[in-house]
Amino acid sequence: MKKKLTAADMHDPQVIAETPWFSMRKVGIDVAPGERRDFYAIHYPRPAVGIVAIQDEKVLLIRHYRYLIDKVVWAIPSGGVDEEEDPAVAALRELREETGWQAQRVEEIIRFNPSYGSSDQLFITWLATDLRWVGMDAD
């Protein structure tokens, strides 16, 4: 039977790389008696947000190139939460920056960890309704 891992099985955490947005950590994990393996994970100090914007029964998506996967994808507006920023405010900011639309109403849908096998990033998804066009910023 496979051993159920707990926090007590984790030892010697180390930050091995750091950026302004995340850090990479290494931790020793006791996977069996006398057997310790190194595990690597990405730590995000702040959550990311996404916003599902609905107007006239249609979902607003953005289309953009993602260099990490070398593909053009359809996605909901999303991005990181700035330091000291409220996640709802961040979601509304991302909606405006990426689409030119502003929402009059926003409510949290779900919080989840999309890559829990390799990172601790928290992703908070919001529902935006009562949209109005305010235009894209010049930059």
Describe the residue ranges of each PLM region:
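A short, amphipathic edge element
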Residues: 2-15
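Conserved Nudix-box catalytic region and its N-terminal flanking loop in Nudix hydrolases
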Residues: 2-5, 42-93, 110, 134-135
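Active-site-adjacent beta-strand/loop module that shapes the phosphate/pyrophosphate-binding cleft
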Residues: 26-33, 115-135
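Beta-rich strand-turn-strand
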Residues: 84-89, 98-105
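Recognition helices and adjacent regulatory flanks at domain boundaries
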Residues: 65, 94-97, 101, 124
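Acidic, metal-coordinating catalytic segment for phosphate/diphosphate chemistry
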Residues: 12-50, 55-56
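A short coil-to-beta-strand element that immediately follows conserved catalytic motifs
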Residues: 9-10, 102-109
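Short, solvent-exposed loop/turn elements at beta->coil junctions and helix N-caps
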Residues: 13-15, 110-115
